[in-house]
């Protein structure tokens, strides 16, 4: 189905895709000549072959070191003024990603302290840190689509493991 639309790449995301063995799916997509991008918390072993991995860690289910080391991109959701420093302390020495995006947590996107902490961190540290924004939430595509599942609470659902 994806190949019929001739996309530049396919993104596997939603919930936590790595709770599944994705080898068969990625093999089939690669056979069709498609590049595959994975978005994950990094908390589980990645089973499948991906061309690009974006890791967005969650507080209560830390990412595996092997995933931190191999991810091309990291997305940190900044939910407090000290969040960036806390994540840097936890994972900074392991991460080898070329891009580390700092996104304000959606419900705090207008908080001057949060925005300033991102701005000052990027100014002080430069690459690989970049300021980002969760544009998909601004467009409300998920909340306006009757087929979409309810959103997950801030930071995930500890009872469900993500």
Predicted features and spans:
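Glycine/small-residue-rich loop that forms an oxyanion/phosphate-binding "nest" at active or ligand-binding sites
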Residues: 1-12
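Conserved AdoMet/S-adenosylmethionine-binding subsite of the radical SAM
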Residues: 7-9, 18-161
């Amino acid at each position: 189905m994806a190949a019929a639309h001739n996309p530049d790449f396919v993104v596997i995301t939603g919930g936590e895709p790595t709770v599944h063995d994705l080898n068969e799916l990625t093999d089939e997509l690669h056979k069709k000549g498609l590049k595959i991008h994975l978005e994950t918390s990094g908390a589980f072993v990645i089973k499948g072959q991906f061309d690009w991995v974006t890791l967005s860690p969650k507080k209560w289910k830390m990412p595996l070191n092997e995933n931190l080391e191999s991810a091309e991109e990291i997305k940190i959701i900044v939910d407090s003024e000290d969040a960036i420093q806390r994540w840097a302390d936890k994972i900074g020495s392991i991460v080898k990603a070329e891009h580390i995006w700092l996104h304000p947590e959606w419900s705090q996107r207008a908080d001057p302290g949060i925005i300033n902490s991102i701005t000052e961190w990027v100014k002080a540290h430069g690459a690989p840190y970049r300021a980002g924004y969760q544009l998909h939430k601004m467009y409300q595509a998920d909340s306006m689509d009757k087929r979409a599942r309810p959103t997950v609470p801030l930071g995930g659902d500890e009872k469900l493991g993500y």
